[in-house]
UniProtKB/Swiss-Prot annotation:
It comes from Haloferax volcanii (strain ATCC 29605 / DSM 3757 / JCM 8879 / NBRC 14742 / NCIMB 2012 / VKM B-1768 / DS2). A glycophospholipid binds at residues 173, 504. It is a multi-pass membrane protein. The record marks 165 as: Important for catalytic activity. Its EC number is 2.4.99.21. This is Dolichyl-monophosphooligosaccharide--protein glycotransferase AglB. The record marks 55, 376, 708 as: Interacts with target acceptor peptide in protein substrate.
Length: 1054
């Protein structure tokens, strides 16, 4: 090497100093990827790929479609939300296109379904790891390379929502959102900085001076493209446009007040948002203004922000040319915005209401009751979540971020305060100190914002947010803030608000926390004692300086992120390594039932023998009400399970995790009789197509008050009812010295719970159920402040009492207002009548007893009422039960006494679980002794029907024929008179509607001599009114027998 080459060749030390961040960042990415892929094998079960959650399954459908139609995404999907269909909305986005492209590349243009599924399986881990790149780059701009790497390390170690959404298997679009938002924020920051440096103004634009405008124009266009790509991944990403718009107002008003031209910032806003708006016209799917779908809202709102930037710049020019006092400019800007909002609300009220509602439930701490039934949409510090986890608010934050949230908040405070205090202006310093004091008061005295909120009728958190926002605006108007830092501050504030409004947005907040800590590290290194901010040579660094930095970093990172710690009563925190263990979850318990449905029910379009099979991956054009062919049908379940039904069952759910059909599903599943359920179905669709719903799937969680049962009560709107109409909490207290604690808690169910359709299906399989002589007793207690009353088990410890007969139980309840019959387990308060058009056709192989949550629920209920949990387990507690809605076989009966009760019974055999149950239905005879029934269970003809001819291959079959019994009476002294018809066959074709006709049943009168000592039989048979004309009917005898069995089970367990 020549001397000249040696002279200009960089040394190893120089290379390390210039490029050390590359290997460090690469290592961080690899570690993040490894952590996120550790559970890969858990998602491959017997060669089948599973995913966790619900939305990932619909992304699988979208990716499969895009692979078949690359690069197009599905424009409309009739395979969900029967009988309407819907657009994919925030599914079928650039995320699905990227995954499909990867699968096509790896599969050499023809990937197998297994490869497509595995590509989607690992996608969240890849995007989660790659999010560290924009995080580092933003952190580098705020805190230098060392700060950027510190932020990257924090992101790597976070164990909370950001990690969970980026784990293998959680293939929702969530984790791709912060990835693309990060790059959009970065591009906007660069564009703003370039504009501050190059200073583009109107004169340069008018003169078309491209040389002067080239750099700000280039970066503004890139910022617009990056923002559009972010919204292509998630249409509600319009939030970032709103954040940028808010920044533009603050920055341009501040610049003008402080004597700078607002046109530099306006240039970035106008160009970038125009580009974003134009690009957002490309993916429009439906001509509407919905926030969650690709419609007109995204492009028009973006163009509105661009136009607003131009207007504010023009207003500033007019202000200056007319020599108006610049101090009034911000007030006029604020007034103009207010007038614009009012006009918008008047001209387009529905659009305004939609935007305002979504804004408040996203960042305004105002998520509604229906939204809060979604676990990921609950407030981050929701009281019920903290209580159930035994956590404090600080403990909850610590479990998610460790100390990094608090150090990030400190960085944000310093970012606001630094420009105020650095000039030594006492007024500005006083403002900063006063603002911090006020924020501290709001935090330490929550009753203050609560009182203001109560007076104004708004959430206390929204009051605090408004006050803090006003303080930040005041600070911005008084000091000089770098454009990109002010933008980051506004972005951080809104994202923090969103994360505390809905817990899911913590996967965004993780990036904010990381970059704010990057900024904090740089500021800390610049403290005189440390003095490392501008060090160029390692020789200039002392051991004391290094030790100070290392100790500070370890204090931030070690608790929670590196070493788990105890968080109050909420248990021990988890590190990222510990929290990365995951699996597919409940879907594996549904898979068998959905596979059965795919193979044993008619294909869509072929029900009843029709020949209109729907193409599963077909291309369907947008419509607001899809015209389904004859033979298509819906499958009703709670909306959580809709995507599983679509993808794993290849059937069309009525409701889905888009919450489409959620209200109708709630009204149907909680219907108190078949007539109400039928009216719900016929109300769906203009021509009542909802009546073509053929199957209902119910799992144990839907029927459990400790799981999902409460969710439909929030959506239900058929009448004004609430959760308390179905069940109420019951507590068992325990005295420990002078302290009283809750030893156990469960629920006491009302009759309305047992009469809801989904409970009648899951618990009783549509059969009638008699009340049992079991009484639950309680005491009323009042809370310490006297505002609430609640139920506790009696102080003598006996919460459940059993009686020999119903009369005795009813007499006890009549004399004790704090007691009721039944209300625990599957024991109703009153008789529950049979369903006529629903039959169990399949139980899952898996039992609910495999669920830890189900077991804990049984144990808790048993402990509350002093019972063994076994007494509360229903017959056949399968995880999932599938029912068919059938016309039913009509029975025309005769031969019974007039105006009496006839009971039909048949024993059914569940071929999957190997258990038996008896279906029972009763009917009243007329004056001629005739009766009519509609029976949903058949006894013969199973082999003649199946999916090949448009019907169901049922997995629940009769063990014999029906038995029909009329009243039993004792006449004279020794003759028993009964009416019976045994082993009556009901053909499958009559039940499923394939055949016309009725079942004719004639009850035969039987007499049998009863040989009893003495003449007491006639007295025993007398009714309460003194008659002996057969008043002791078979119905009452059946009730007595059933009651004694139930009562003995509970009594033995007590």
């Amino acid at each position: 090497m020549s001397d000249e080459q040696t002279k200009y060749s960089p040394s190893i030390a120089e290379l390390a100093r210039d490029w050390y961040h590359i290997p460090v960042l690469s290592t961080i990415i690899l570690v993040m990827l490894w952590i996120r892929l550790r559970s890969y094998d858990a998602f491959i079960r017997e060669g089948t790929v599973f995913f966790s959650g619900n939305d990932a399954w619909y992304h699988l459908r979208q990716v499969e479609y895009t692979v078949r139609n690359w690069p197009a995404t599905m424009p409309f999907d009739p395979w969900t939300e029967f009988p309407f269909g819907r657009t994919a909305g925030q599914f079928g986005t650039i995320y699905d296109q990227l995954v499909a492209t990867a699968a096509l590349v790896v599969g050499l243009g023809s990937p197998s379904s297994d490869l497509v599924a595995k590509s989607l399986l690992v996608a969240p881990a890849v995007f989660g790891a790659l999010t560290v790149i924009p995080t580092y780059l933003i952190g580098k701009r705020l805190g230098g390379r060392l700060g950027g790497l510190f932020g990257a390390v924090i992101l790597m170690l976070l164990p909370g929502t950001f990690l969970q959404r980026g784990l293998v298997g959680f293939a929702d679009h969530n984790i791709v959102e912060p990835f693309f938002m990060g790059f959009a924020v970065l591009a906007i920051m660069i564009a703003l900085t370039v504009a501050d440096r190059e200073k583009p103004v109107w004169e340069l634009v008018a003169a078309r001076d491209l040389d002067a405008l080239r750099e700000p124009l280039k970066w503004s266009v890139l910022a617009g493209v990056a923002t559009a790509i972010y919204m292509w991944s998630w249409p509600p990403g319009i939030l970032l446009v709103g954040i940028f718009g808010l920044f533009l107002v603050l920055k341009m008003a501040s610049d003008y007040v402080r004597g700078r031209s607002p046109e530099h910032t306006a240039f970035v806003g106008a160009i970038s948002m125009t580009v974003t708006g134009l690009l957002m016209f490309i993916p429009i799917e439906e001509p509407g203004f919905g926030v969650t779908d690709f419609g007109f809202l995204q492009p028009l709102f973006s163009l509105g922000v661009a136009l607003g930037a131009v207007f504010l710049a023009a207003l500033a020019r007019w202000w200056e040319s007319n020599d108006v006092d610049e101090r009034y400019y911000p007030a006029v800007v604020g007034g103009t915005m207010l007038v614009g909002i009012v006009l918008f609300s008047l001209v387009l009220p529905s659009v305004f209401d939609s935007i305002a509602r979504n804004f408040l439930r996203t960042v305004g701490f105002s998520a509604g009751a229906a939204t809060r039934t979604i676990s990921e949409a609950q407030p981050f510090l929701a009281a019920n979540v903290l209580q159930s986890n035994g956590q404090t608010a600080v403990g909850r934050i610590m479990s998610e971020y460790g100390f990094t949230f608090f150090t990030g908040a400190l960085a944000a405070v310093w970012l606001v305060a630094k420009p105020l205090v650095k000039g030594g202006n006492s007024r500005k310093i006083g403002y900063a100190v006063g603002s911090l004091a006020l924020i501290g008061v709001l935090f330490l005295i929550p009753a203050l914002p609560a009182g203001i909120g109560s007076a104004l009728g708004v959430e206390p958190s929204l009051v605090s947010l408004t006050i803090v926002t006003a303080l930040i605006v005041g600070a911005v108007m008084q000091a000089d803030y770098e454009s990109e830092r002010l933008f980051v501050l506004v972005w951080a504030a809104i994202i923090t608000s969103a994360a505390f409004t809905q817990v899911r947005f913590n996967y965004y907040l993780a990036v904010v926390v990381a970059v704010m800590n990057a900024y904090l590290l740089r500021e800390a290194l610049g403290i005189d004692f440390v003095g490392l901010a501008n060090v160029e040579r390692f020789d200039d660094i002392s051991y004391g300086q290094v030790a100070a930095v290392v100790i500070a970093v370890l204090l931030i990172l070690t608790p929670v992120l590196i070493i788990p710690i105890q968080l109050g009563n909420g248990g021990v925190s988890q590190t990222a390594m510990q929290a990365s263990q995951t699996g597919p979850g409940t879907v594996t318990q549904w898979d068998g039932s959905l596979t059965w449905m795919q193979n044993n029910t008619p294909a869509e379009g072929e029900f009843g023998g029709e020949s209109n099979r729907m193409e599963y991956y077909g291309t369907y054009e947008y419509t607001d009400d899809f015209d389904y062919p004859d033979g298509a049908y819906g499958v009703m379940s709670w909306w959580d399970y809709g995507h599983w039904i679509t993808v794993l069952g290849e059937r069309i759910p009525n409701a889905n995790p888009f919450q489409g059909g959620a209200t109708e599903a709630a009204n149907y599943l909680l219907a108190e009789d078949e007539q109400q359920a039928e009216s719900v179905l016929t109300s769906m669709g203009d021509d009542g197509e909802g009546d073509q719903t053929r199957y209902v799937m119910v799992d144990w969680q839907m029927a459990s008050t400790d799981a999902k049962f409460s969710a439909p009560t929030v959506f239900y709107d058929e009448s004004n009812i609430s959760r308390s109409d179905f069940y109420n909490p019951m507590f068992r207290l325990q005295e420990q010295g002078e302290q009283t604690t809750v030893a156990a808690a469960s629920s006491l169910k009302d009759q309305r719970y047992y009469e809801s359709l989904m409970v009648r299906l899951y618990a009783y399989h549509g059969s009638a159920r008699e009340a049992s002589p079991i009484v639950v007793d309680w005491e009323e207690r009042t809370s310490a402040d006297g505002s609430t009353t609640f139920r506790v088990t009696p102080s003598d410890g006996q919460a459940v009492r059993t009686f020999d007969n119903m009369s005795a139980a009813e007499e006890y309840v009549a004399n004790d207002p704090t007691s009721q019959i039944g209300g625990i387990g599957t024991f109703p308060e009153e008789r529950v009548s049979a369903l006529e058009h629903y039959r169990l056709v399949k139980s899952s192989n898996s039992s609910a007893l495999r669920s830890g949550s189900y077991q804990r629920s049984l144990i808790s209920e048993g402990n509350t009422y002093g019972l063994q949990p076994q007494a509360l387990v229903p017959n056949n507690p399968a995880w999932v039960k599938t029912f068919e809605r059938v016309p039913g076989a009509t029975v025309d009966g005769s031969g019974a006494p007039a105006n009496t009760t006839v009971t039909a019974r048949v024993q059914m055999r569940d071929l999957t679980t190997g258990t038996n149950f008896t279906y029972t239905q009763q009917a009243q005879t007329d004056a001629d002794g005739e009766f009519t029934m509609t029976l949903p269970y058949s006894t013969t003809g199973y082999d003649e029907y199946g999916p090949d001819n448009g019907y169901t291959n049922v997995s629940v079959r009769a063990a014999g024929g029906y038995a029909f019994t009329g009243p039993t009476s004792v006449t004279g002294n020794s003759t028993i008179v009964s009416y019976q018809a045994e082993n009556v066959a009901v053909d499958e074709g009559l039940v499923n509607g394939a055949e016309d006709g009725t079942v004719q049943v004639t009850l035969e009168r039987n007499e049998q001599e009863l040989d009893l000592p003495g003449d007491s039989s006639s007295e025993d048979s007398s009714s309460e009114d003194g008659t002996s004309d057969g008043s002791q009917t078979n119905e009452s005898a059946s009730t007595s027998t059933s009651a004694s069995v139930d009562a003995s089970a509970v009594s033995a367990a007590a």
